[in-house]
Curated annotation (Swiss-Prot):
It comes from Xenopus tropicalis (Western clawed frog). Residues 333-347 have a biased composition (Basic and acidic residues). This is T-box transcription factor TBX1. The keyword NAD does not apply. Residues 323-332 have a biased composition (Polar residues). SMART domains: TBOX. The keyword RNA-binding does not apply. It is found in: Nucleus. The gene is tbx1.
């Protein structure tokens, strides 16, 4: 794992903080005794079948389960919780547990706030599912946090790991839309820790922005050699977030237990699946994921208010910040309304996907009542091309036939260059295009590929 960190701090890191000692000593000593008790949250779809989660044996899973996150006090923020601080009021510890370790002042005052908590809560009410694939799949919602209380001049590393919630394997009952216990858990997967790629960094850098683990991927490949987190499908997991102080002392291994602090957010626990089981999870992921627009019937902002998920205003702002070509907000102005449909119309004003037969076909293909297969949420880092968004324009009253313009879709690179779509269509298959060069100021070149057909002769040599 250390080799994955390409940073000039790598040489000093070997003296500052022994990462292997952290994973072997700190995490194992996090809760050497006691179980990982998690009381079901309100509306938890698992609670009706499982009144509580009993700890599984550490010998079976090779995990040392952490204590549960204590319930926040009255008036306290429920979005920030430090679960690893001994003596913080957590339950489930036995009388033989180790004495509380006094945390280093560099980490003692650190607090963490979970971003997009409303969205996480909405998924948690339904029973969050995360796709795992052999190649690795990113999480959605992405685990993002805001950190407070760090020493601005000290160096910190940020890590994540995943621990089983219990020792059970689950199956989804479609007739009752609920999860049922299917038996004992499968053999434990190799435990791995994901390091944030910016680690280590100064506390000032971590605190000035939202920390996102968008590079983290989940896999079910036991032989994975890409550093992804390995999980068993149909098992429940709890993500844990760790803040590690890079101790400059040469004997920092002795202080491993006091140089880190762990945070657990119960609303982020999930079931690992290879395909979404709950259709409501599928619909919510499509509605709230900015990279899943291709699977929507229409723009979420055009949905009726009573059918719109409560987290969409938050996710629409997130989508606009991550995707510059997404729809701008509706503020009642005609200019914004025209901008929202900029990519759905060509220069002549013809609405794309406006044909009635096409709308009927799309409505059948994209009907929310049809079962949607898993893996629909492409979390690529690139921006999606607007022409490929299967979006129906509810404002279009009709459409004119394309006639001899069968290629009236704007080019993908025009959007990245900020240019308007070309008035001329793509060359027809009968026209040879190997000598084509774009001359925006040359009428002959512009008319060469017009709908009227190519000229009788064209000089391909230099002029």
């Amino acid at each position: 794992m250390i080799s994955a960190i390409s940073s000039p701090w790598l040489t000093q890191l070997s003296h500052f903080c022994d990462v292997a000692a952290f994973t072997a000593n700190s995490l194992s000593s996090l809760n050497a005794s006691g179980g990982y008790h998690l009381s079901p949250s309100p509306g938890d779809p698992y609670s009706q079948h499982e009144p509580h989660y009993e700890p599984c044996s550490a010998s079976q899973h090779s995990y040392s389960f952490g204590h549960a996150c204590p319930e926040p006090e009255s008036g306290a923020s429920s979005s920030s919780c430090a679960s690893s601080t001994p003596g913080s009021g957590s339950t489930g510890s036995s009388g033989s547990s180790k004495a509380p370790v006094k945390k280093n002042p560099k980490v003692a005052n650190i607090t963490v706030q979970l971003e997009m908590k409303a969205l996480w809560d909405e998924f948690n009410q339904l029973g969050t599912e995360m796709i795992v694939t052999k190649a690795g799949r990113r999480m959605f919602p992405t685990f993002q946090v805001k950190i407070f209380g760090m020493d601005p001049m000290a160096d910190y590393m940020l890590l994540m790991d995943f621990v089983p919630v219990d020792d059970k394997r689950y199956r989804y009952a479609f007739h009752s839309s609920s999860w049922l216990v299917a038996g004992k858990a499968d053999p434990a997967t190799p435990g791995r820790v994901h390091y944030h790629p910016d680690s280590p960094a100064k506390g000032a850098q971590w605190m000035k922005q939202i920390v996102s683990f968008d590079k983290l991927k989940l896999t079910n490949n036991l032989l994975d050699d890409n550093g992804h987190i390995i999980l068993n499908s149909m098992h429940r997991y709890q993500p844990r977030f760790h803040v590690v102080y890079v101790d400059p002392r040469k004997d920092s291994e002795k202080y491993a237990e006091e140089n880190f602090k762990t945070f657990v957010f119960e609303e982020t626990r999930f079931t690992a699946v290879t395909a979404y089981q709950n259709h409501r999870i599928t619909q919510l992921k499509i509605a709230s994921n900015p990279f899943a627009k291709g699977f929507r019937d229409c723009d979420p902002e055009d949905w009726p208010r009573n059918h719109r998920p409560g987290s969409l205003p938050l996710m629409n702002a997130f989508a606009r910040s991550r995707n510059p070509v997404s729809s701008p907000p509706q503020n009642g102005s005609d200019k914004d309304g025209d901008g929202r449909r900029e990519y759905e119309r060509d220069t002549s004003g013809t609405p794309l996907h406006g044909d009635a037969a096409h709308q009927q076909l799309m409505s059948r293909v994209l009907s929310p009542s049809l079962p949607v297969p898993g893996g629909l949420v492409p979390l690529s880092t690139g921006r999606p091309s607007p022409p490929h968004e299967l979006r129906l324009d509810p404002h279009s009253q009709g459409s004119e036939p394309l006639h001899h313009h069968p290629y009236k879709y704007p080019t993908s690179y025009d959007h990245y260059l900020g240019a308007k779509t070309r008035p001329a269509p793509y060359p027809l298959p009968s026209i040879r295009g190997h000598g084509y060069h774009h001359h925006p100021m040359n009428p002959a070149a512009a008319n060469m590929y017009s709908g009227a057909g190519a000229p009788g002769s064209y000089e391909y040599g230099p002029r």
